[in-house]
């Protein structure tokens, strides 16, 4: 199992953040709920050994959530977070970029509503692997 040196189980306190938002897709306003949180991984002895961080977007006006599709996405790891998957094309907001060239590849970027977001048809969970 991959274990990061920066993970200190004795002092680690999992974080959790929640918010509500709205995005307009194809002229329709879509409400959603976001949960961003640490997910602790426990070893065979029951002690925490690592953590992954997730960004979850749930459409909040859906009545039948049992049949709603969920997209799970991650980018590499260890050492490669889901930042470009998240802020590049799957999140409800994304970086604004017209053409990415060598000089502008590292920003700064403006952040805009993502017109190609999938939240209208599926919930989205973005995963930062251990060590990112």
Locations of regions flagged by a protein language model:
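N-terminal cap/lid subdomain of alpha/beta-hydrolase-fold enzymes
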Residues: 2-3, 48-132
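Catalytic-loop region of hydrolases
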Residues: 1-70
């Amino acid at each position: 199992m991959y274990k990061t040196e920066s993970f200190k189980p004795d002092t680690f306190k999992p974080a959790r953040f929640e918010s509500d938002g709205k995005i307009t897709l194809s002229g329709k306003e879509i409400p959603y709920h976001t949960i961003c949180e640490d997910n602790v991984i426990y070893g065979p002895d029951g002690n925490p050994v690592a953590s992954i961080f997730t960004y979850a977007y749930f459409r909040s006006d859906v009545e039948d959530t049992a049949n709603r599709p969920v997209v799970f996405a991650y980018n590499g790891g260890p050492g490669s977070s889901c930042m470009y998957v998240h802020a590049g094309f799957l999140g409800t907001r994304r970086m604004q970029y017209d053409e990415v060239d060598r000089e502008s590849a590292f920003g700064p970027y403006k952040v805009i509503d993502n017109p190609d977001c999938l939240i209208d048809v599926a919930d989205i969970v973005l995963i930062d692997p251990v060590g990112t």
